[in-house]
Swiss-Prot record:
PROSITE patterns: RIBOSOMAL_L3. It comes from Bacteroides fragilis (strain ATCC 25285 / DSM 2151 / CCUG 4856 / JCM 11019 / LMG 10263 / NCTC 9343 / Onslow / VPI 2553 / EN-2). One of its GO terms (cellular component) is cytosolic large ribosomal subunit. Part of the 50S ribosomal subunit. Forms a cluster with proteins L14 and L19. This is Large ribosomal subunit protein uL3. One of its GO terms (molecular function) is rRNA binding. It comes from the Bacteria. PANTHER family: 50S RIBOSOMAL PROTEIN L3, LARGE RIBOSOMAL SUBUNIT PROTEIN UL3C.
Length: 205
């Protein structure tokens, strides 16, 4: 899927043609630079590696510095691969948000907000154990039983329990493109996308 790297700016709302107030996410999409072109003959598959956001040379490792010099571009902070670009791209070419002109829907990949260690009520939507009366006083938000006793004498894998919540790679599909503002490299997408303000996202057609 062809696409771009972008940065989530935040959320706002716009009015639709019929006067409805539509919540939307503002994403700074690109400009991205081609840092590597992969071919079926050499790499086994065809893809384009894009770089987003400049960074200083002193903060770049020597292997990556050689990679960028080979492409003839300045060091980039974020890299990602995309497939199936319609136009043939060469090293150093720039891909802008105009890629999404005419696109009705996109998929957005991001990293969800980290919530730390959370219990089963917040993490999995459990309802808690029973009533708050009839002698119960210390198990309102507990998971309850996690298995039988002597058989199977173990807790099955995949049992939903408390633990680290968030910080996962999340893909949201078929989000409507409301507007492309090419002069400011902005993309307005209906609804919310994963991640906090300033987080890096992948936008795919």
């Amino acid at each position: 899927m062809p696409g771009l790297l972008g940065k989530k700016i935040g959320m706002t709302s716009v009015f639709s043609a019929d006067g409805k107030n539509v919540p939307c996410t503002v994403i700074e999409a690109g400009p991205c630079v081609v840092t590597q072109v992969k071919t079926v003959e050499k790499d086994g598959y065809a893809a384009v590696q894009l770089g987003f956001q400049d960074k200083k040379e002193k903060h770049t490792t020597k292997p990556l510095m050689g990679h960028f010099k080979k492409a003839g571009v300045t060091p980039k902070r974020h890299l990602a691969e995309f497939k199936e670009f319609e136009n043939e791209l060469n090293l150093g070419d720039t891909v802008t948000v105009e890629l999404f002109d005419g696109a009705d829907y996109v998929d957005v990949v991001g990293t969800s907000k980290g919530k730390g260690f959370q219990g089963v009520v917040k993490r999995h939507g459990f309802g808690g154990v029973g009533q708050s009366t009839h002698g119960q006083h210390n198990r309102a938000r507990k998971p309850g039983s996690i298995g039988a006793c002597s058989y199977p004498a173990k807790v099955f894998k995949g049992m939903r329990m408390g633990g680290q919540m968030g910080g996962d790679r999340v893909t949201v599909q078929n989000l409507q493109v409301l507007k492309v503002i090419a002069e400011h490299n902005l993309l307005l997408i209906k609804g919310s996308v994963p991640g906090c303000k300033g987080s890096i996202v992948l936008i795919e057609k």
